[in-house]
Every structure is written in structure tokens, then in C-alpha cells.
Amino acid sequence: MKNKGENILTFKDEDNGDQITMYYDIWLTVIREILMKYANKTYAESLKILNKHYYKKPVGYFECIYLSHELEYHWAMIGAYGEGYWLNDGCSELLPTDYYEWYKKFLDENNFNEPFEFYG
């Protein structure tokens, strides 16, 4: 698979040698598309949301692991609706029924890697 952009980040846990690679541009692109598809945001609104602190580039192994432990859908909904978004009327913590199908199709159509790869 092809990746997008120069923002390929690799971090190593110095204690056990585990490594994680993050395709940061792909991660942001997936979140942007989720915001437009599932939160009904415009392209401009999505770009503005991606400027929030949730999406800052990680600078170390544990920051990267933190971002990888939730699906991109979760990060998109936090950006759109805030922490605890699932407690708001009209928002659910449940994934849309077509999410995994849409996600795989989006990555395939754009020839993208998964946003995270784990080694170790």
C-alpha cells in the first residue's frame, strides 16, 4: 500500500523494544472524512476541527500509543462534539453499522496504509 505525505512517525518503547509507526497524514485524513460523513461537517468545518489539541502530532511512543488505542471514529466524534459525546442527545458510543465497511473501502480506494502499525 501507498502512504500519503511525509508525516511517517516511528517510536520505540525503550523498556521493551516495541515499536509503533503512525502514518499521521492518513490518520488525519480518515478523521476528516469521518467528520464529513458521520458528523455532517463541511470540509472547512472538518479542517477547523482538526486544529484542536486532540490531533496534535505525537512526539513520543506513549503519545502515539494513546492515539492508537481508539478508533478514528472516536477521535472524530470527540472533535465534533467534545469529551463524553456519547452522553449528548443524538450521539451514540456505538459505531454506525456501515463503519467498518466504509473504513476499509476508503483506505482501499485511496491506496492508504492503516494509520498505525505495531512491531515487537
Residue ranges and their predicted role:
Residues 1-120:
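C-terminal alpha-helical interaction appendages
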